[in-house]
Amino acid sequence: MLTLYLFTATCCFVCALPRQAQVDTAICHHTWPMCSDVPHPTSSAHNTALSSSHAISIEHRLLHSPSPPRENIRHSMRCRRRAIASSASTPVSHTQPLAANHRRSRITYATTDPTNSPTASPAKSDKLEADADPALHRRPDSLLRHLFQPCHAQRGTSNRATSQRASLNAVHHKLCGAMISSSWSTTCTPAIMDLPSLSVELSAGHKKKETPTEGGWGGEEGEDDVLATIRNTLSAPTSPAAATTHRLSFPEGSSFCLTAVSEYSQRLTSTAALTPPPPAVAAPFSFSSTVSETGAFPQSTAGRTRVDDTAVVTAGDPRSPVTHVTLLQIFRLRSSLLTSRSGDTLRGGEHEAIPKVASLFWTLLKATQTVEITHKTPSADSHRNPQKYTDRPQRLLLTALAIWQRTYNNTRADHAPQVRLLGNILTYRRPQTATASAKAHTQQQPEEPKGQQIWAQTAGQAAPHGDEPHSDGELRRESHSAPPTSRTLPDTILAVKRRSVAQRSHVRLDAKPGLNDRDGFRRRLLLPLSGYFRANELRNQQFMGYGTENGLKNTCLTRPLGAAGGVRETIGERQDRDVADSATQRVFHTLYAALQTVRVWYTALGTAWRTSGSRTRDSLFDGPRRRDRQAGRLRRLEL
């Protein structure tokens, strides 16, 4: 009976093998060890009833095991995770029947669902004739090659290059897949991406023919896997002037950063449609100013419903990458605008960048006017998964506008005319020359206190207003905060009498006749620890060693100022951290010393306790040598 059972089991086992193998190859490149590798149980163990029953149980487990053995679980998990990460929005369906002629199945994407595929999918009937026309199905091999890289690629051997390539893959996918599905949004997480070759061909003549593979990008066999070029022929806005094809490509490696700020997003209610002239006119830059008096940024939204939780973009072409590619280009231009550091004019004259931006905007607007945006309230659980870019729709155009509005205190603008220029571009004002706009700026805020300067000195420029920079009684607000909205907020947060520059640099505080020691002490504490004083004071000789080991740490300017103003930490913060740091060091030091003492004591006590049993009272109190001598005598006696 037993042998019969064993025999049937092995038969089932062998029959199960080929089917098993096929399924496996579908799942991943190399899978958990297949059953054929396991030494056959019956061969070694048919001697005793006990061992054979054991073998049966083993084999039984192998056949009916609900899950593969452990390391293989890990392996398949790894594969699955990588698959999920790489195909961002696209689920892989293994459920579709394998084509008859392929032994190794090809992974097919469920393209029927409109939300998943940003591009048109090849017709269903073609799926079976994949071998007949390889151009239709370029996906399986190349995609498999670089999306599901064989698992050893991810082991500890990775270096910077591989990880970078992985992240690039992710970025590409996210960019063309997930980000397209939510183009506009209230909150923007900065997405930093670097697409060395991003070329857009806009032409009214051809609508987009076939966009290579899913997600808007595909690796052909010959191409570099990671940076597969985005080569979509995009449908252009229907306008007479756009019939010319612009082909803009940018120098390799210029990286740019999109960050959008949602401050204004709640107040945007104006639904004025933008109708700028076609780019032929727009190039000399006469935009009709459509900015309403409230300063709200005009949005071309047909109707806004705040109920819907998903940002849906509906247009003739549902998720056309046009918008995105254009935006990316605009932002790349913007970054080059901001980084050119020449004083009053853009490097190479203004005429280069502007028409480009103008035409790009034209495309963008035409694309956007057909688009109706269901505007989304930040979803209820957005705090639970903040890392998804997709669930907070991003209104990218607001970015630059916000940069403009918050050019720190609106003062920095004098030093960065590029920013002002950009602001003009983005708000469709007719740009003035830099100097004129600066003058207008200064007249327009006459009541702004003199001292409200962005560390002009630190940045190395002379301060434009004020006779002597930062002179006596004047006190500046924190420079990084916006000027107070209501006039009720007092301009001076903290009033301290200041001396003229000459005195400040040479005289020690305590030597100042008006102050007694206590005052001097108080003031010296107050200066470095309160956030309201600028770096040039803290860099000053008398505070040098104060509050940190190295007084220069006191300068709160972490990074050098960029064109748009430095990225600064909160003013008090850097110092506070340093001071707190030294304090904690002190505490821990004391603690450590205490612990050492305790440890020593315990050792002593332990020794005493361990040795105490064998001692007599007099041997407790005399030296160890003598005791040893006694012990020796005793031992000798015993012998």
From Swiss-Prot:
Q: Where is the composition biased (Basic and acidic residues)?
A: 465-480
Q: Where is this region: Disordered?
A: 80-128, 432-488
Identify this protein by name. Answer: Uncharacterized protein UL150
**Where is the signal peptide, in residue numbers?**
1-16
- Gene designation per UniProt: UL150
Where are stretches of biased composition, namely Polar residues? 108-122, 432-446
User: Quick check: keyword Signal in the entry?
Assistant: yes
The alphabetized UniProt keywords are: Signal
